[in-house]
């Protein structure tokens, strides 16, 4: 859309009124095509933020980003089983170990098909992509190779900038604004594999139910949107607020570590470090040699994923399956297999 054709939509925003899903998609399409100047972009993002983004607006922005993404060739057998993403918005302010990334290896080794959409760090010193790079896993693996990994190994990692090139147009504005905008919640919603199932952690308890409604609007089959006592994942150090999407309905409840059959730990026990240190921690967990707190934090998140995929009938059973999978060594074996496939492709 040209500057003149988006002006009526901007005028609606500047009056403090909400846009429709389609109108928001039009604005974000213009942005990611590089056809929106930075002053307009900043004004648009702040107008949305100050009023508060609606479900329709978040869904519309996600529609535009999904439509513009580099295609992912979805493997047939994975489609019949269904794919899950275990992902967080980041930005929770805690520098924890890489819980969701490590949980992805465990869930995949236990039988789930995991397509993890990730980026470099937002709130910690080490995001999922920072961690994977430590293991020699190629972040810019072709979509075709990633699809083959999903098919044969049950796991692939999709590096967000590799699939969403248009986001680069927003980077200078986001850096200049130095505040959260709609982009902070979009990342988990725009996985190019379009997973049927999602375990999605959010940085604020106020986002739990709205983001579940967005997933509902986007056609996600089953999901748990979680905020765990300050963390954008299921908490081992306190209660977790959940909005679960199942059979088209959203139910809200709380979970505690006891619901997973594991003891509570202190948040300080989950503190992470630089990528190299976090890689060592992940390796220890997957080898069955991690601390109880590290292992349990990963297992309860993997357990929720296994529950959502239908591989266990409760989060407690899912956690037990995750712990057994770690003990078996299968998750560590999977890490080595993925690194091997990645390095062979780079030769």
From Swiss-Prot:
Q: Where does 5-phospho-alpha-D-ribose 1-diphosphate bind?
A: 88, 91-92, 96, 98-101, 116-124, 128
For the ligand (Mg(2+) 2), the binding residues are 232-233
* Domain of life of the organism encoding this protein: Bacteria
Q: Which residues bind anthranilate 1?
A: 88, 119
A GO BP term here is: L-tryptophan biosynthetic process
UniProt cross-references to Gene3D superfamilies, sorted A to Z: Nucleoside phosphorylase/phosphoribosyltransferase catalytic domain, Transferase, Pyrimidine Nucleoside Phosphorylase, Chain C
Binding-site residues, Mg(2+) 1:
100, 233
Q: In which pathway does it act?
A: Amino-acid biosynthesis; L-tryptophan biosynthesis; L-tryptophan from chorismate: step 2/5
The protein's required cofactor(s) are namely: Mg(2+)
Which Pfam families has this protein been placed in? Glycos_trans_3N, Glycos_transf_3
Q: Which GO terms label this protein's molecular function in UniProt?
A: anthranilate phosphoribosyltransferase activity; magnesium ion binding
Known EC number(s)?
2.4.2.18
List keywords of the entry alphabetically. Amino-acid biosynthesis, Aromatic amino acid biosynthesis, Glycosyltransferase, Magnesium, Metal-binding, Transferase, Tryptophan biosynthesis
**What does the note accompanying the cofactor annotation read?**
Binds 2 magnesium ions per monomer.
For the protein in the UniProt heading, the enzyme class is transferase
- What residues does anthranilate 2 bind to? 174
**Reactions mediated catalytically:** N-(5-phospho-beta-D-ribosyl)anthranilate + diphosphate = 5-phospho-alpha-D-ribose 1-diphosphate + anthranilate
**Which cellular components does GO assign to this protein?**
cytosol
Similarity annotation: Belongs to the anthranilate phosphoribosyltransferase family.
What the entry lists under NCBIfam families is as follows: trpD
Q: What does the UniProt record say this protein does?
A: Catalyzes the transfer of the phosphoribosyl group of 5-phosphorylribose-1-pyrophosphate (PRPP) to anthranilate to yield N-(5'-phosphoribosyl)-anthranilate (PRA).
Q: How does it assemble?
A: Homodimer.
* Protein name (Swiss-Prot/TrEMBL): Anthranilate phosphoribosyltransferase
